[in-house]
């Protein structure tokens, strides 16, 4: 399999280039990521992310089911945050603002330590995987939001020029 470089691909593919520093064996100080979603969507997002950029550390998932005890799930999120926090902060990503996963995550926000980013999508995750080793929490969360918005498109409008 040939690896393509950003210069060889059209558009702004730099957002999708894997960061291979993770595989060099060093323990990195980085922003932790916790994916909290309805059902098992969080696990699938993690699998898709790792398919695109390779294995990731300091990432956890929490699935919220319709019959789950909310206090138990809140504690699961709290434990996941503690597990991925290396001191650079944690971004909790949720699938939909106002939904149960988002509301539980918001109850755990801490200024400059734990932030919640709702509207999870794959471009957002890929961007965060790229920037979380070298960015401050506040910067990374905005970059993730920007990437998530940037890649929402109506194909026919783009192709029509």
Spans of model-derived segments:
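Intrinsic low-complexity, disordered N-terminal segments enriched in polar/charged/small residues
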Residues: 13-15
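Cationic, low-complexity basic patches in intrinsically disordered or flexible, solvent-exposed regions
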Residues: 9, 18
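N-terminal loops that bind phosphate or other acidic moieties
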Residues: 4, 19-161
């Amino acid at each position: 399999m040939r690896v393509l470089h950003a210069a060889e691909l059209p558009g702004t593919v730099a957002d999708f280039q894997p960061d291979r520093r993770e595989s060099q064996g060093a323990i990195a100080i980085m922003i932790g990521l916790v994916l909290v979603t309805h059902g098992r969507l969080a696990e699938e997002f993690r699998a898709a992310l790792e398919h695109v950029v390779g294995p990731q550390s300091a990432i956890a998932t929490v699935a919220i089911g319709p019959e789950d005890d909310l206090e138990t799930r809140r504690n699961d999120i709290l434990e996941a945050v503690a597990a991925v926090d290396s001191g650079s902060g944690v971004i909790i990503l949720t699938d939909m603002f106002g939904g149960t996963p988002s509301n539980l995550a918001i109850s755990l926000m801490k200024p400059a330590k734990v932030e919640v980013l709702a509207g999870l999508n794959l471009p957002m995750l890929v961007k965060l995987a790229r920037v979380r080793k070298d960015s401050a929490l506040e910067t990374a969360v905005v970059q993730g939001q920007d990437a998530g918005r940037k890649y929402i498109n109506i194909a026919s409008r783009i192709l029509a020029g």
